[in-house]
Amino acid sequence: MTHSIFKSGRLILSVTGLALLIGGGARAQNLREGDIDTGYFGNVALEGYDTVAYFTVGQALVGDPGIKADWLGAEWHFTSTGNRDLFLANPVSYAPQYGGHCADGMAYDTNVQTNIDPKSWRVINGKLYISYDPVSASEFDTIPDLIERADANWAVRQASVASD
């Protein structure tokens, strides 16, 4: 009997640990140098779109290459110096989830290589999700567990990268 209680306790601890790892959206992103998706060529995040504009004006707007910031090894473009300053004050709040990698692709695989379309996006619970097409972006509103699956896959991917 003691053995099965121990097993049960270990299961509870494992599930609790997984919940803390995934975080249910409450955790900060685990981003490191080199995690930002800059496409196959160049070093520009979000194909040059202003990550702050998604939050402040609710639109995908192309940033000005003359108004930029460097963060985590990527160059970020902005439509105004005000947006750049907001980003630099708290980049994790404005950076897209999963380093800008395709969010719905991340929900299905830990090694996403899908191109993104910065015009295919959603802000859900204060977090920016970028997808590869409008239909996929809209799925984040309609398929409840996509974000949880993507968060779990991102955690696995980050753990895998850290152990390499």
Sequence positions of predicted segments:
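Bacterial N-terminal signal peptides
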Residues: 12-23
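Charged, low-complexity intrinsically disordered segments
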Residues: 27-164
